[in-house]
Structures are given as structure tokens and as C-alpha cells.
A protein has these predicted regions:
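Extended, low-polarity segments enriched in aliphatic/aromatic residues
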Residues: 1-200
């Protein structure tokens, strides 16, 4: 997109805090900050239709997976370009179903362990870190969510953000619960598993 139709009050503000429940998503594979902004800030009548619908088609849901990822990401880029450096992202990795919150009571049950809260001023780094944490879990823990991500081509969100220069896909995890210690995704998941075992 060269432009995006957003909610009418979006431009009333000069800064933005993006608070996102990280989880799976029916079309996006996963819903992180990119999905939250790209879909959440697009206005309902025009912007969301641009993202979901192939030009000339009446069916709102006919778009191919990767094209959907790219349109959603371009919608996000319009918003973050507007706010510039005055934007911060927070992803909450708790109660992660393969389904979006918008599905309500029809959402699939939660089967992925709670991880915690991640935050960054770099959206790509944040969404990449969340995905990496999911992949670092055991097969039993992440199977359903990874299957949802891969079957919907969800990783295209990350590669397209990088292509558009929307952040850095390399990151450092800093554990604030342990004095700001640097940890890997695998270490973060190990600590999570140890905590879960200690509660049993």
C-alpha cells in the first residue's frame, strides 16, 4: 500500500504504546505487535477491506496467506512511520491459544505454557523473540501453535518486516526478574519449565 485508512482518532496522538496478547491467529498464523497494529489500527470500513480482500472480488476472505501477511505488514508500516520513534511495544505471552482473542468462547483451548511479558522499542525484534521462544519449547508444548504458524505461512510476517526495514530480527533477551541478566530463548524456556516443575 502507498497509504492506509486508519481509525479517525489515530492522528490525534503523537505517541503510541502497543499492548498485545501474543497468541495464534486464524489468518496470520500468530498475532503479535505487527498483527495488532496492522489490523487493529486499520479502520473497519475501508482499511480492513483493503487488507483482507483481493481487488475485484466480493469474498472478504479469499486472499492468499502470504499476500495477507504482506498487506497487514504494510498497514502496520504506515502507522509506525507516522509515529516514528514515539512508539513502544509490549507482548504478553500468557494464555496462548492457536486462536485469536476475537474468537471468544469459540477459541481453541490454551495448550502452550505461559512465558511472561516481553517489551521493546523494535517491533520486529519483539515479534521475532516471541516466535523464537515458542520454537524453543518442547514439541509437546509448542506443537499446536507452531502448526498454526507454519500452516498459515505466518513467518512471512517477520521476513517481510525485515524487507521493509521495520526493525532488526536479531535481539538480546534481558531477564529483568534476574537482575538484567542476558539469556537465550532456550534458557528462558528452561527457566519456565523449572518454575512449572517446582509448582507441581
Amino acid at each position: 500500500f502507498g497509504k492506509m485508512s486508519v481509525g479517525s482518532h489515530t492522528t490525534d496522538y503523537n505517541s503510541l504504546v502497543v499492548l498485545t496478547h501474543f497468541k495464534g491467529h486464524t489468518q496470520g498464523g500468530f498475532g503479535g505487535s505487527n498483527k495488532n497494529i496492522g489490523i487493529g489500527c486499520a479502520d473497519g470500513r475501508i482499511g480492513k477491506a483493503w487488507i483482507h480482500t483481493t481487488p475485484g472480488q466480493d469474498n472478504q476472505w479469499d486472499i492468499r496467506e502470504e499476500e495477507f501477511m504482506e498487506r497487514m505488514t504494510e498497514s502496520t508500516k504506515a502507522v509506525i512511520d507516522y509515529f516514528g520513534k514515539q512508539i513502544t511495544y509490549v507482548n504478553v505471552m500468557r494464555n496462548m491459544s492457536v486462536s485469536c482473542d476475537c474468537e471468544g468462547v469459540n477459541a481453541a483451548p490454551v495448550v502452550t505454557p505461559n512465558v511472561g511479558i516481553l517489551s521493546s522499542t523494535d517491533m520486529l525484534a519483539l515479534d521475532q523473540a516471541c516466535v523464537d521462544l515458542v520454537y524453543a519449547m518442547t514439541e509437546a508444548e509448542h506443537h499446536d501453535l507452531v502448526e498454526r504458524i507454519e500452516s498459515r505461512h505466518g513467518l512471512r510476517q517477520l521476513s517481510y518486516m525485515k524487507e521493509l526495514g521495520m526493525g532488526n530480527d536479531r535481539f538480546i533477551l534481558i531477564d529483568l526478574d534476574n537482575g538484567g541478566k542476558r539469556i537465550t530463548a532456550a534458557e528462558a524456556v528452561e527457566a519456565l519449565n523449572e518454575l512449572a516443575e517446582s509448582r507441581n
